[in-house]
Amino acid sequence: LLPLRTDGVALEVDVQLPDQLTYPIFDLNVLLGNLLDNAIEATALVTPKENQKITLKMKERFGALQLQVGNRFNSNIVPKNGTHKSDKINHGLGLKSVQEIVRRHHGKMWIVPEKDWFEINIILYDSNPEKLQGSGKSI
């Protein structure tokens, strides 16, 4: 994420995780990698450059992992093939991977698109029901 800061993108990060995570690190890497890659791609097209912004919020509460990635986007630009990426063949595989991880962890995913802001929210649930009491509060 450091290159984003040096490139002038406003970056807000709020990550509050325990030392011992109850979720596989591989799954977290896939989630963050794909969601941030999509946010970076969309934000790069925003003009003027001063309006470029990405947010990342992540915390674990009562055994549920809450993740939110938001970014500004240019709502006027809709690419012909649904992507600006050069690898159009593999386009969409990242989001499918994210959806599979959400399904595997009995989670929920919802997207909030607004005029110039896009936000994706994910909650993954731990299999330990005792930890889930009181969950459901948003980030």
Predicted regions span which residues?
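Short beta-strand/loop element within the Bergerat-fold HATPase_c
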Residues: 50-63
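A short, flexible helix-to-loop-to-beta junction within the catalytic ATP-binding CA
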Residues: 40-48
